[in-house]
Curated annotation (Swiss-Prot):
Subcellular location as annotated: Virion; Host nucleus
GO molecular function: RNA binding; structural molecule activity
PTM field: Late in virus-infected cells, may be cleaved from a 56-kDa protein to a 53-kDa protein by a cellular caspase. This cleavage might be a marker for the onset of apoptosis in infected cells or have a specific function in virus host interaction.
Biased composition (Basic and acidic residues): 8-21
Region (Disordered): 1-21
Stated family: Belongs to the influenza viruses nucleoprotein family.
Name of this protein: Nucleoprotein
Gene Ontology BP, a term: viral penetration into host nucleus
Motif Bipartite nuclear localization signal: where in chain: 198-216
Gene: NP
Transmembrane segments: none
């Protein structure tokens, strides 16, 4: 992307940093990871978890959610002002799982939010360490992206379920900051904007008064974030139109839906970060590893190296397949929910299956599920190779607008050719070409039509041996291109419902 120079790197977003050099960035990301690890160790002590229980991913998720809840100021304020029966706004908690007499039992714990905040700040040298909180949010978001398909949310806003590969980060909270905005897919941003416009249509005071002014600023900011994800002039020009509209309405919704469809071929740039559960960082810190001193990157070899040596366990329901559960978590850890399965399989070194073929439900266990027949097993999170995470969208040629793969949003910077059946996508673009954006629409359609499927994305980029830390010898895989490897396509994954 030509404008790369004006953008902050993920690590700067992740650490709210000013311009830093690579070493400073690695150190500040390392500091953030170390803080999460120290917090996790302290929480395991508080909860009297043994080593095995502390490495249980379900316990990790509960502890992570407690700290996110403790720092959710808006919700905390709302809860104080709207007390609901049986809910203490000052407390947070969740299920903690322990081994008792050879069986797993669920124990519901409750803590003062103030106490959790104190432990978190103490682990982070007295800071609020918002970057660490965002990091945890992105891990939860990546896990949701891997576990659930957002078809229903898409259909509700008048979009097509085929656009699920644009939905990265759709469950991220609004307060996730610049680092969160970077990992949101084009579809996620479009969905947020359409929801906003619909509210404005139904509630005439939405854009008015002091609150309306704030709403308007938020609307324009979201438009700019989305504009920044597009890589062609025509798509960006259309976003300017949407942003500058005096009174956003159905015309804007149509423009946004058109843009989302166009992003299936003219891919947006969406960041990918490997955010791991706290129960990976904790034991690493406990073993004496100094993340800040050693430095850490979310987009290089570091997460792969960390997962190679980590032991993480998971509870398994009676009819679930532990290998499938492992794949789910592996994909979440590598932010690979929308990557081509052939690329993921090559990197992982074992075949990665589409969601509908997995015999596993989500990682979290509902409070009404019976614990009697629940067992635990080791998650296999290691990989055969490592690869650099990308944010380019995989368009083949940046000078001339060109195609990225259709049903996926690439995670890894690894060469692949583009099998796609353009006709099905192009069929969606017949119809409305008049109105104020007609020339831009025509240009976008022309670019999409000229995109050639025989092109190659990430030319010359390969994967690396885990011993090749400096990424000196790229191994360029060759893929059988008879089928395109989308994780969700032709599939029936459960829906995510908030």
């Amino acid at each position: 992307m030509a404008s790369q120079g004006t953008k902050r790197s993920y690590e700067q977003m992740e650490t709210d940093g000013e311009r830093q050099n690579a070493t400073e960035i690695r150190a500040s990301v390392g500091k953030m990871i170390g803080g999460i690890g120290r917090f996790y160790i302290q929480m395991c002590t508080e909860l009297k978890l043994n080593d095995y229980e502390g490495r249980l991913i379900q316990n990790s998720l509960t502890i992570e959610r407690m700290v996110l809840s403790a720092f959710d100021e808006r919700r905390n304020k709302y809860l104080e002002e709207h007390p609901s029966a049986g809910k203490d706004p000052k407390k947070t908690g969740g299920p903690i799982y322990k081994r008792v007499d050879g069986k797993w039992v669920r124990e519901l714990v409750l803590y003062d939010k103030e106490e959790i905040r104190r432990i978190w700040r103490q682990a982070n040298n007295g800071d609020d360490a918002t970057a660490g909180l965002t990091h945890i949010m992105i891990w939860h978001s990546n896990l949701n992206d891997t576990t659930y398909q957002r078809t229903r949310a898409l259909v509700r806003t008048g979009m097509d379920p085929r656009m699920c590969s644009l939905m990265q980060g759709s469950t991220l909270p609004r307060r996730s900051g610049a680092a969160g905005a970077a990992v949101k897919g084009v579809g996620t941003m479009v969905l947020e904007l359409i929801r906003m416009i619909k509210r404005g249509i139904n509630d005439r005071n939405f854009w008015r008064g002091e609150n309306g002014r704030k709403t308007r600023i938020a609307y324009e900011r979201m438009c700019n974030i989305l504009k920044g994800k597009f890589q062609t002039a025509a798509q960006r020009a259309m976003m300017d139109q949407v942003r500058e509209s005096r009174n956003p309405g159905n015309a804007e919704i149509e423009d946004l839906t058109f843009l989302a469809r166009s992003a299936l071929i003219l891919r947006g740039s969406v960041a990918h970060k490997s955010c791991l559960p706290a129960c990976v960082y904790g034991p690493a810190v406990a073993s004496g590893y100094d993340f800040e001193k050693e430095g850490y990157s979310l987009v290089g070899i570091d997460p792969f190296k960390l997962l190679q040596t980590s032991q993480v366990y998971s509870l398994i329901r009676p009819n679930e397949n532990p290998a499938h559960k492992s794949q789910l978590v592996w994909m979440a850890c590598n932010s690979a929910a929308f990557e081509d399965l052939r690329v993921s399989s090559f990197i992982r070194g074992t075949r990665v299956l589409p969601r509908g073929k997995l015999s596993t439900r989500g990682v979290q266990i509902a409070s009404n599920e019976n614990m009697d027949s629940i067992v635990s097993s080791t998650l296999e999170l290691r990989s055969r190779y490592w690869a650099i995470r990308t944010r380019s969208g995989g368009n083949t040629n940046q000078q001339r607008a060109s195609a990225g793969q259709i049903s996926i949003q690439p995670t890894f910077s690894v060469q692949r050719n583009l099998p796609f059946d353009k006709t099905t996508i192009m069929a969606a673009f017949t119809g409305n070409a008049e109105g104020r954006t007609s020339d831009m629409r025509a240009e976008i359609i022309k670019m999409m039509e000229s995109a050639r499927p025989e092109e190659v994305s990430f030319q010359g980029r390969g994967v690396f041996e885990l011993s090749d830390e400096r990424a000196t010898n790229p191994i360029v895989p060759s893929f059988d291109m008879s089928n395109e490897g989308s994780y969700f396509f032709g599939d029936n994954a459960e829906e995510y419902d908030n």
